[in-house]
Amino acid sequence: ALEYFQETDGVFDCTIEPIMEAWGFTTHDYRVPDSSELSGLLPLVDASAVSLNGDQVNLPSGVRLDLGGIAKGFTSSRVMDIFAQNGVTSGIISLGGNVQTLGRKPDGSLWRVGIQDPGDLNSMFAVVKVADEAVITSGAYQRYFEQDEVRYHHIIDPRTGYPADSGLTSVTIISPDGTLADALSTSLFIMGPEKAAAFWQQHKDKFDAIMMTDDGTVLVTSGLADRCQITSSGKVEVVS
């Protein structure tokens, strides 16, 4: 988590827990905190203040960790490692929609993983073919509450304390590294389409991405061009 804090210039911050609690996303007691409350909590959101000494984690007073942004990706990667160590050559696991594959399907073909349509949760807007990769999505439609006819989702920008308003509604990361895919699906969502595309261009050897903007445009990185099928009727752009 600390590595991704550095790599994303603080966009991924595992010390976001006080803000998440203020919004009720950790307690399910949902509410909209006022700006003064968030201003008082933001100084506690700074992963650079966390230090490691072997297996000991040192936190300043008031700083609390929320590893939800990488936990499922980390877990699925470790499960696949255990499978491989025990002679399993083909498998797929889904943890709350976080999909990780081991090898190919038993018949030798690639796994086909669908990506949920934010506008119609009963359908998919894309299908990607993968082997030995994770497919992990972060979306504004996954966890949210409504107050006074305004929707507030759970992907909080650690720089502002508010739900990210980046122009993206869904980000899917495809990578051999489930932990990376989990962390970056959140991070690129917060960055928004332009900065997310620039980040991918700097790290295209590590992952690919499928992103949907608020207006329904689908952005697909060029590494997926030959193994991604877009089924939505919206505009499609290839990021290269």
Predicted segments with their positions:
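Mature catalytic core of soluble alpha/beta enzymes
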Residues: A1-S240
